[in-house]
A protein has these predicted regions:
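N-terminal cap/lid segment of alpha/beta-hydrolase-fold proteins
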Residues: 38-62
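Alpha/beta-hydrolase
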Residues: 203-281, 285
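Conserved hydrolase catalytic core segment
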Residues: 145-188
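Flexible "cap/lid" loop of the alpha/beta hydrolase fold
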Residues: 173-214
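Active-site loop/oxyanion-hole signature of alpha/beta-hydrolase fold enzymes
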Residues: 109-150, 154
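Conserved loop-alpha-helix segment in the C-terminal half of the alpha/beta-hydrolase fold
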Residues: 277-319
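Conserved HGGG/HGGXW glycine-rich cap/lid loop of the alpha/beta-hydrolase fold
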Residues: 61-117
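Catalytic active-site module of serine/aspartate enzymes centered on a nucleophile-bearing elbow/loop
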Residues: 311-343
Length: 343
């Protein structure tokens, strides 16, 4: 998303003061006192935040994490989307997971947010990011008895790759709003979503993509009402939450374009041929698949993923790609129920 469009959305938010809000269920029980016991944690003196040194083929780098809560039976690591987005937009978890007594970790992957940004495309491979996640797991004390991953969008892709390599070190997996195939994702956009769009706007969007004008303000001005507000976060841009705007404004655009491609309506970068659907049957840990009715991810395909997984479970929401915002009641009720069940 362009800085111009983000500033416009931010200004509209300030003027209207009408950010969408959904309050957590006040009837939920408070977590036990032990949830707030920070003794023994290396981040106890810093509000849960710290940096972890990871090793790469290009030398050591530091990545930022922040722990919330204390629950030895369940450590949930959050993998953000993009690629290139920071942890900021998943701060919505702070409104729900503490009351459920879930220990979880915000995390900026290398090249994003508060983590190091070496700006080195040689480090932008799935295998290296899988290794990075494994180093973070070890640093937070994650084991097969307590470690769970929640990956959203690109983070869901990364979570699937991690599970295929290291499910012996996992307790559970949450695939949030990510299909197991980029070719299938592209087909859904081209054959289902694009025909439903305003065709005059679509023609302009495709023309700008073909001529390499995706960084111009007009591109996002067309995409915001015709794509983002329909499929990404189903609220007017003036109501988009501040954490979402902050994550987008701080996005590593070069990383995103290299992996995803310049188009917002399909992938053409390094991930273009990624497909793991056939391998899902080998993931035997409990897995929740979250699917939004209006998402850019095909709901029927997401349902098939849940069936392909031996212990898969589908959570169908009435939201878009960020249904943790635009259908919070369903998203968090299903997520928390799943985590409590595997805990």
């Amino acid at each position: 998303m362009s800085r111009t469009m983000l500033l416009a959305a931010s200004a509209a938010l300030l003027l209207t003061g009408s950010c969408y809000q959904s309050s957590p269920d006040a009837s939920r029980q408070a977590p036990p006192a032990s949830y707030y016991d920070n003794s023994g944690h290396p981040d106890a003196w810093s509000g849960g935040a710290r940096k972890i040194t990871i090793s790469t083929l290009k030398g050591p780098h530091q990545v930022w994490i922040k722990r919330v809560g204390n629950n030895p039976k369940l450590k949930l690591l959050l993998l953000t989307g993009g690629p290139g987005l920071s942890h900021a937009y998943l701060e919505v978890m702070d409104s729900y997971l503490p009351a459920a007594g879930i220990e979880y970790y915000h995390y900026d992957q290398l090249e994003t947010g508060e983590s190091d940004r070496p700006n080195d495309p040689d480090l932008w491979t799935l295998a290296r990011y899988v290794d990075e996640v494994d180093q973070v797991r070890r640093a937070i004390g994650g084991t097969k008895d307590n470690f769970c991953l929640l990956g959203h969008s690109w983070g869901g892709l990364l979570a699937m790759e991690y599970a295929l390599a290291h499910q012996d070190q996992m307790k559970c997996l949450v695939i949030s709003n990510m299909m197991a195939s980029i070719p299938a994702y592209n087909r859904y956009a081209k054959t289902v979503l694009e025909p439903r769009m305003n065709q005059a706007a679509l023609k302009q969007i495709l023309s700008m993509e073909a001529s390499g004008k995706t960084e111009q303000p007009q591109y996002m001005q067309l995409l915001m009402p015709n794509w983002y507000e329909q499929h990404i976060l189903r609220r007017p841009a003036a109501q988009w939450p501040e954490p979402v705007l902050r994550a987008q404004e701080n996005m590593n655009r070069r990383f995103y374009v290299t992996m995803q491609g310049p188009s917002e309506m399909g992938a053409s970068g390094r991930l273009v041929n990624w497909d793991r659907f056939a391998d899902l049957k080998t993931i035997t840990i409990p897995t929740l698949v979250v699917s939004g009715k209006y998402d850019t991810m095909d709901p029927a395909y997401m349902a098939a993923m849940a069936k392909q997984l031996p212990h898969g479970e589908l959570a169908a929401t009435n939201g878009g790609h960020m249904d943790m915002y635009d259908d919070q009641p369903t998203y968090f009720a299903r997520l928390i129920a799943f985590l409590r069940k595997v805990e």
